[in-house]
Design a protein with these regions (language model features):
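Short, solvent-exposed loop/turn segments at secondary-structure junctions
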Residues: 5-9, 47-52, 158-161, 167, ...
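Extended, low-complexity cationic-aromatic segments
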Residues: 1-135, 270-271, 275-277
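Intrinsically disordered, low-complexity regulatory regions enriched in Ser/Pro/Gly/Thr
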Residues: 34-38, 144-147, 173
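Generic structural signal for small/hydrophobic residues in well-ordered secondary structure
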Residues: 3, 44-46, 128, 132, ...
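Acidic/histidine-rich, metal-coordinating catalytic segments
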Residues: 2-4, 128-131, 142-162, 182-193
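C-terminal anion-handling pockets and recognition modules
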Residues: 194-299
Length: 299
């Protein structure tokens, strides 16, 4: 499963505790416009390996997280900014890059379009071709950790994911190997493990980490990415496994409601008893009752 997410260099919590008696002094921060707050986009990939049925539990792992960036050609020499005594910013510090140098910039995610040297893009096709597909091949191929498993790839219907060239490539690649490419239905983030659980968890931890390290200030794009990568690395696999089981059970609710998502507004909309029925392991979840669930086709 894969998806994209923006991480911001500053996130203010409306209900953060501000109690002077406890040593938590009220502080304020204002930005003239949201565009003044740095951000970077990441693309994350998770996986869940199981036998016969997700209801049997399984092993989850992180395939990777990638910053949406590409090389750009510098059009002029750039120096570091130096704050002057009167508070003004003057670009008179050491040389950062010279005209003609290549440097990495954050950019938009596309399906196949690499953009230009002046306006580069981050194409998903290249990421799948050079990294994701080879990594999955190593996992499920001969001698791999999950030899014999059949990969099923799921993404949403965002613009880059629906790019004709990208879809043609990934569907053809999967078809040639007996794999499956199964995009989720539109407007159903509750069926995507990343939107459902992983990204909300990461977002909260990212904000806490940034606040602990840098205080109440806007982080640079590099600092924002470093924090996102750190949060990703400490994300526990069993939490991802739990999210896969949760999404599977939510899908059953969607089917029972004939596609209607009104149940999500109820108090127990996304609560499906995962903690009740499963216990966590180091890298996944197992059933508490020890039962083995047959494949759906044989049930």
């Amino acid at each position: 499963m894969f998806d994209e997410k923006w991480f911001w260099g500053l996130v203010l919590r409306s209900y953060a505790k501000q109690v002077a008696e406890l040593g938590i002094d009220p502080r304020s921060f204002a930005a003239y416009h949201r565009n003044h707050i740095n951000k970077c986009m990441v693309v994350a990939f998770t996986a869940f390996a199981f036998v016969d049925s997700i209801e049997n539990g399984g092993v989850a792992f992180k395939l990777g997280i990638y910053r949406a960036e590409a090389h750009k050609v510098a059009k002029q020499m750039v120096r570091e900014a130096v704050r002057q005594a009167d508070g003004r910013i003057k670009y008179c510090g050491p040389v950062v890059r010279r005209k003609g140098d290549l440097y990495l910039v954050d950019c938009a995610v596309t399906g196949c379009n690499h953009g230009t040297l002046d306006n580069p893009k981050f194409p998903l096709k290249a990421l799948f071709e050079n990294k994701i597909f080879p990594d999955v091949e190593a996992l499920v191929g001969p001698g791999g950790q999950f030899e014999g498993h059949i990969p099923i790839f799921q993404g949403d219907n965002a613009g880059p994911h629906a790019d004709a060239g990208f879809v043609e490539y990934v569907e053809g690649y999967c078809r040639s190997r007996g794999w499956h490419w199964e995009p989720q239905a539109p407007q159903m983030p509750h069926m995507n493990v990343l939107d459902l659980s992983v990204f909300p968890s990461m977002s909260k931890q990212h904000t806490m980490l940034c606040r602990d390290k840098e205080g109440l200030k806007v982080l640079t794009e590099d600092q924002t990415w470093d924090a996102a990568e750190e949060v990703w690395m400490v994300l526990e696999n069993w939490k991802i496994a739990s999210a896969y089981i949760q999404a599977y059970r939510i899908a059953k609710k969607v089917i029972a409601a004939k596609g209607n998502n009104g149940f999500l507004g109820n108090g127990d909309g996304i609560h499906v008893g995962v903690r009740r029925d499963f216990q966590r392991t180091e890298n996944g979840m197992v059933r508490i009752d020890g039962n083995v669930i047959a494949p759906p086709a044989a049930a």
